[in-house]
Amino acid sequence: MAERSAPVGVMDSGVGGLSVLAEIQRLLPSESLLYVADCGHVPYGEKTPDYIRQRCRRIAEFFQAQGAKAMVLACNTATVAAVADLRERYPDWPLVGMEPAVKPAAAATRSGVVGVLATTGTLQSAKFAALLDRFANDVRVVTQPCPGLVELIETGDLGSLQLRQLLLGYVQPLLAAGCDTLILGCTHYPFLRPLLAGMVPADVAIIDTGAAVARQLKRLLAARELLADGPARDAAFWSSADPRSLENILPVLWNTSGSVQRLQL
């Protein structure tokens, strides 16, 4: 039985999961957090499901070895490929995944047209198709795969002309289709909100699922009486690539500097 003071493991293919980590820290400030950025294998969106499953299994084993009381897959593509496999392997371990916010977007739209920005892997998945079948019968959903966005966000330069032009090229067709609600279907994309705000009309809603994931984690921990009640330890970071890259980005995306350890899996 895990202890209340045990940490929560959060993983992503790279730095995108920091957007989810921030929501978890905001809602659950007493929780100690471990973060693995699988930067040596980014982007997951262009990898095969089996490849992603193998990566997630190794990271789950690492979190288990660290004594983590729960694991969050802060990556839509990893959730699609691996969450069912991990739940089968660890039936008693709280696992939280990500999925595009189709349900709240379908409820929020006024035009009846919802746009989705996501990776190719997420948009082509059976899990995403099932979400549309379940929640989007009464709206039109326009999808936009976004190759290249994750890699540019990974550099930490969120104001670059290249990033701005690429994002604009993905957003314009959605607006032209009449979308008044945009789903950010990748955990990297919330870092683009300031850019998006300058590209879309003020009445276009932008929706992501980071806060919902934090709430689900809280529910799972509370149900098992595992919510921490003491002061949290500082978040610990690992990267499967050069740690200096993540260390340089942390002040930009996490608003705090920190040391990053190299993780070879």
From Swiss-Prot:
Keyword presence, Isomerase: yes
Name used for this protein in its record: Glutamate racemase
PANTHER family the UniProt entry points to: GLUTAMATE RACEMASE (PTHR21198:SF2)
Enzyme Commission code: 5.1.1.3
Record InterPro entries: Asp/Glu/hydantoin_racemase, Asp/Glu_race, Asp/Glu_racemase_AS_1, Asp/Glu_racemase_AS_2, Glu_race
One Pfam family of this chain: Asp_Glu_race
Catalytic site positions: C75 (proton donor/acceptor), C186 (proton donor/acceptor)
The family this protein is said to belong to: Belongs to the aspartate/glutamate racemases family.
Binding site for substrate: D12, S13, Y44, G45, N76, T77, T187, H188
Record field: catalytic activity: L-glutamate = D-glutamate
GO terms, biological process: cell wall organization; peptidoglycan biosynthetic process; regulation of cell shape
